[in-house]
Each structure stands twice: as structure tokens, then as C-alpha cells.
């Protein structure tokens, strides 16, 4: 079931999903309006003469103009989108194209123009004027005019949205919002339940005579693990499963992804069940990958610190948003990797993230790229100071202190101005 939900989530976030729905809606709306026109005979006189077309030629003319304009504007919208994607790719990184493509407003506008074009074609096809038969779908033509007016407003909204969306502050804000959402969804609801153990449990290998290595079917990024499927099968067959990877890891075909401990010999079909619980693709996805949005934010900061861009303010904005995330993570209870059944029997050992790993993902690369930018290094120390103050766990404080030490060592080697180094050390005093 979780695998189906993953595929459904991927479909919903695809670029063609909303346009396809709008096109289908346009086809249905066209036939509904044509049916209504067949059932209702409108007398075109008085004030109605200004609202409805009175001849087949005028109806065809209106629909032809609208359909031509809609497909032309659809091409313009597509071109504007490509230009925005090009700018985003060059300034913020190609991996951020996913965020621009999957924005709902882009899909709605493109789908609205294409669906209006298809609607006009269908209605245009049913207009008839012969010696014996005359059918002018006046309501359908009026509805096409209303759609055109709506699409004009959509075009204005779309242009405004594109102009705003390529600004660095907006990009950082959107990534921060996505990061906050992903973190709150995945933590504490991560693989592995909150089962308190004093130390790592010892695998009862003396009771499990057979050990099987589950290997990856293909190379690619691990996008999803159906942990419930693995747990249920392990519990049903009295197995212990240890996962050697987590979503976001890159897998090479044939590499071990899990180990299965069994009392009895297992058939190949049983191992295939485990393989089917792993979904591998060409790119990383945010569904279960907690570091995905963090790496997107880090990529923006890294590009901002590159010699060709040299934009420390964008890097500082990224650091500030990452600080908010790390402060949140310092308060959540990270899940245990050990999952037990109702009888407290170990069934699944997951590969889970911890606070130190998330802290490394957030600040390591930025520190490395910021060696020639004292202002960014100082802001990094200020961020660590905030995280250190925010957390009350000793192991988290030690992880923050380790990063502060690395920043100080970097500054001692790269800072030219002594006052900058003094300023940095003053900010680190709270941590030490």
C-alpha cells in the first residue's frame, strides 16, 4: 500500500498531471455544454443579442480566433517557463529545476490554455448550418469567451509569479519551506519506532542458522523503502532484517542493500519480496530522504560562494534557514533503528539518520566553500552558537562543538585580517 502511495505522490507532483486533468475536464465540459445547447433553445433577441452569436459563421469565427490565440499563448507560456528554468539552473543549480517544474501555478496556466484550445476545437466541430439543419451552440461559445477572459488574468498572474520566483530570496524561502515540511513529516515519524534500549541489542545469531544478502537489482538513487512490507514479512516468517542503506543513498547494481537472518532456509522468491520493497530511480526524491532539501539549500549556498557569483548574502540567508531546521531537530526525538513486534522480538534494523549526520549535511560543505569569505564563516559560528544554546542534550552539544572547532581551525589558516579572527573567537566563547 505504501508503495502505491509513493507512486501516487510521484504522479501528483509530475509536470503533466494537472494539465492532463484540465484537458480531460475541457473535453467533459465541451460535451456537457453541447448537450445543454441541444436541450435549450435560446431566443437571441433583445439583450441576449449582445451575449450570444446569431449565426454559424460568427460562432466559427469567434471559436477560431480563441483557439488560435490560446495555442499561441500556450507556446509563449512554455517559452517563458523554459527561460525561467534556464536562469534557475545557471544561478541556483540544475537540481532545483524540479522545484520550478512542479509549482502548481505553472502547471495550471499551461493546462488552462491547452484545455481551452481543445474545448474550442470540440465545440467548433459540432457547429452545423445546412439547408435542413442549423445548430449553433450559443452557450458553448459564450463559455469559451468566459474561459478566454479567465485565461487573460491567469497570464498576468503567471508573469508576476515567474518574475518573483527567480529572485534568490524567493528561491531560498521556498526551499526553506520545503525543508521545514519534509523535516516535520519525517521526524519523529521515521523508520524505527520509539523503543527505548540502553545499548545496541545483540543479534541472536546462534538461533538463526542462515544469513542471506539482498542485492540491488539496478544502479541508481534509493528513493523509497516499504518498511512496513519488510517488517510484516519478517514478523510472519520469524526473520530479522538489517537494512544497509536508506533513502537518498546511491546504489550500485549487485551491492548489498539488506541482510536477512533466518532459522530456516529461504527460497529465492522470498528474497525477491525484499527486493520489491526498494524503489530505485535516476534522482533523489523528498518523500523519505530527509537530507534532500538540506542538500538543495547547501547547493544554493555553495553556488553563491563560488568565485563567479560571489554572493555572500544569499549564502548567509541559506545558513539562517538551516539554523532554524537544526534548532527544530535538536528538540525532536530521533527514532530508534530497531523495530520490534508485539512480543518485543527484534524484527527490523533500519539505517536511520541522527542529529550529528544532519548537522554534517547542513554545515560541512558550506564551511569548506566559505574559506575565502570571513563574513560567511562568522555567520556559521553564530548559527552554531544558536543551535548550541537551543539544545539541552550533551551529545548534540558535542557535535556542535566539533563543528565550531573545525571553523576555528579554518579561520586561523585563511583569515588575513586579525580583527576578523578575534571577532570569530568572541562568538565561539559561548560554545567553549
Language-model features: locations:
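Well-ordered secondary-structure scaffolds
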Residues: 1-432
Amino acid at each position: 500500500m505504501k508503495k502505491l502511495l509513493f507512486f501516487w505522490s510521484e504522479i501528483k507532483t509530475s509536470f503533466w498531471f494537472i494539465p492532463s486533468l484540465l484537458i480531460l475536464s475541457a473535453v467533459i465540459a465541451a460535451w456537457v455544454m453541447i448537450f445543454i445547447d441541444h436541450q435549450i433553445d435560446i431566443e437571441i433577441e433583445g439583450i441576449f443579442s449582445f451575449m450570444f452569436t446569431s449565426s454559424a459563421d460568427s460562432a466559427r469565427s469567434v471559436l477560431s480566433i480563441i483557439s488560435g490565440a490560446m495555442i499561441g499563448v500556450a507556446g509563449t507560456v512554455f517559452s517563458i517557463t523554459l527561460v525561467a528554468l534556464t536562469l534557475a539552473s545557471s544561478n541556483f543549480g540544475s537540481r532545483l529545476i524540479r522545484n520550478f517544474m512542479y509549482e502548481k501555478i505553472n502547471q495550471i496556466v499551461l493546462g488552462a490554455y491547452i484545455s481551452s484550445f481543445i474545448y474550442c476545437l470540440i465545440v467548433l466541430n459540432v457547429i452545423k448550418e445546412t439547408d435542413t439543419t442549423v445548430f449553433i451552440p450559443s452557450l458553448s461559445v459564450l463559455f469559451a469567451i468566459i474561459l478566454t477572459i479567465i485565461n487573460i488574468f491567469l497570464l498576468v498572474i503567471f508573469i508576476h509569479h515567474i518574475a518573483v520566483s527567480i529572485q534568490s530570496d524567493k528561491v531560498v524561502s521556498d526551499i526553506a519551506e520545503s525543508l521545514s515540511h519534509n523535516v516535520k513529516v519525517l521526524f519523529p515519524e521515521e523508520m524505527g519506532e520509539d523503543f527505548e534500549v540502553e545499548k545496541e541489542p545483540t543479534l541472536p545469531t546462534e538461533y538463526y542458522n542462515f544469513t542471506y544478502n539482498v542485492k540491488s537489482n539496478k544502479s541508481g538513487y534509493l528513493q523509497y523503502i516499504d518498511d512496513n512490507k519488510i517488517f510484516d514479512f519478517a514478523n510472519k516468517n520469524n526473520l530479522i532484517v538489517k537494512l544497509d542503506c536508506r533513502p537518498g543513498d546511491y546504489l550500485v547494481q549487485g551491492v548489498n542493500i539488506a541482510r536477512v537472518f533466518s532459522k530456516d532456509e529461504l527460497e529465492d522468491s522470498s528474497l525477491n519480496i525484499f527486493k520489491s520493497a526498494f524503489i530505485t530511480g535516476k534522482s533523489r526524491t523528498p518523500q523519505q530522504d530527509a537530507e534532500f532539501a538540506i542538500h538543495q539549500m547547501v547547493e544554493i549556498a555553495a553556488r553563491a560562494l563560488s568565485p563567479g557569483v560571489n554572493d555572500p548574502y544569499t549564502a548567509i540567508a541559506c545558513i539562517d534557514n538551516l539554523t532554524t531546521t537544526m534548532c527544530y531537530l535538536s528538540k525532536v526525538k530521533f527514532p530508534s533503528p530497531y523495530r520490534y513486534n508485539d512480543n518485543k522480538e527484534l524484527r527490523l534494523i533500519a539505517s536511520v539518520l541522527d542529529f550529528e549526520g544532519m548537522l554534517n549535511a547542513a554545515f560541512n560543505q558550506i564551511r569548506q566553500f566559505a574559506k575565502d569569505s570571513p563574513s560567511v564563516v562568522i555567520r556559521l559560528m553564530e548559527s552554531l552558537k544558536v543551535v548550541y544554546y537551543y539544545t539541552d542534550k550533551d551529545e548534540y552539544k558535542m557535535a556542535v562543538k566539533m563543528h565550531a572547532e573545525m571553523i576555528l581551525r579554518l579561520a586561523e589558516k585563511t583569515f588575513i585580517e586579525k580583527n576578523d579572527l578575534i571577532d570569530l573567537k568572541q562568538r565561539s566563547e559561548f560554545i567553549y
